[in-house]
Amino acid sequence: MKVNNVEFEFNISSLKQASALELALDHMGEREKKINKKKADPNSRLTEVLSDTLDMFRQFFIEATTVDLLQECDDVREATGIYYRFLDEVKKQKDTITEPYSTDRIL
């Protein structure tokens, strides 16, 4: 798989990697709740929210793939785009393994 000009191995058909992805998504949800609380606090600084958001994405990628796909990224919009491109690639893989099996394919 290649995302953000980084080539790495990730196969959603691997039970180990699928489990890592699910766990990373769970942890991301927890981090997002904390960020949302910070966003709602009028005393929070924008730089804190941006930093926490970048860290949330960075930790997600490291937990899910063991690779820091953000590298030197310091832009939340760019990080969000990288996240969605990764999910698009995972969806493509998932679609191929969840296709219905048919005996017509072997005959």
Question: Where are the language model's segments positioned?
Answer:
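Non-catalytic, well-ordered alpha-helical scaffold segments
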Residues: 22, 51-55, 77-84
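Surface-exposed polar/charged interaction patches
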Residues: 27, 31-38, 60-63, 89, ...
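Short hydrophobic interaction/assembly module
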Residues: 43-72
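C-terminal charged interaction modules
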Residues: 64-107
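Short N-terminal mixed-charge amphipathic segments
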Residues: 1-46
